[in-house]
């Protein structure tokens, strides 16, 4: 990604629609490489013994500070990125890419976002190798999984082009 992007206000609803399958049992994640987006989801996965290769968090839940997730990440390599609400900053995109590269070399990595991590679901779908699973939280619904494949990437890229403008 070459530019910082801003979410178009009239596309916010479309971007927040469920993009995968609601997780009824964490067993579906067995033997999968996981990239998690969100503090609660990451904490739930770690608490159940499923360690995401990459975790993207902002140390908040429902916009309230909650630093407890950080205590689960003691053996993760930590990267920090700025990503204000309603944006997709190039810096954050590149940190997600770096975290994936680190994980492919055998070390788990976390991106701690100064701002908001929600929209980093886009690089979490577009950047990992096929076969990974991106897991995120859908408020009022639960955890959602997106299998990373060509179709998921194309849908994410199309929505990215439709819903964002360079800033």
Curated annotation (Swiss-Prot):
Enzyme class: transferase
Record-listed E.C. numbers: 2.7.1.237
GO molecular function terms attached to this record: GTP binding; kinase activity
Binding site for GTP: 39, 41, 58, 60, 117
GO BP of this protein: coenzyme A biosynthetic process
Domain of life: Archaea
Pathway: Cofactor biosynthesis; coenzyme A biosynthesis
Sorted UniProt keywords: Coenzyme A biosynthesis, GTP-binding, Kinase, Nucleotide-binding, Transferase
One Pfam family from the record: DUF359
Biological function: Catalyzes the GTP-dependent phosphorylation of the 3'-hydroxyl group of dephosphocoenzyme A to form coenzyme A (CoA).
Protein family (similarity comment): Belongs to the GTP-dependent DPCK family.
Matching HAMAP family: Dephospho_CoA_kinase_GTP_dep
Protein name stated in the entry: GTP-dependent dephospho-CoA kinase
Gene source species: Korarchaeum cryptofilum (strain OPF8)
Phylogenetic lineage: Archaea, Thermoproteota, Candidatus Korarchaeia, Candidatus Korarchaeales, Candidatus Korarchaeaceae
């Amino acid at each position: 990604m070459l530019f910082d992007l801003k979410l178009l206000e009239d596309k916010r609803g479309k971007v927040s629609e469920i993009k995968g399958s609601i997780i009824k049992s964490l067993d579906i994640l067995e033997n999968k490489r996981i990239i998690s987006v969100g503090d609660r989801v990451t904490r739930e996965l770690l608490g159940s013994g499923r360690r995401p290769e990459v975790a993207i968090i902002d140390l908040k839940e429902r916009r309230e500070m909650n630093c407890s997730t950080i205590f689960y990440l003691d053996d993760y390599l930590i990267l920090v990125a700025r990503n204000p609400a309603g944006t997709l900053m190039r810096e954050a995109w590149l940190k997600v890419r770096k975290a994936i590269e680190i994980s492919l070399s055998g070390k788990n990595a976390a991106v701690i976002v100064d701002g908001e991590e929600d929209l980093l679901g886009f690089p979490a779908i577009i950047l990992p190798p096929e076969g990974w699973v991106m897991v995120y939280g859908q408020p009022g619904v639960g955890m959602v999984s997106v299998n990373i494949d060509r179709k998921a990437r194309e849908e994410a890229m199309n929505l990215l082009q439709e819903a964002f403008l360079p800033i």
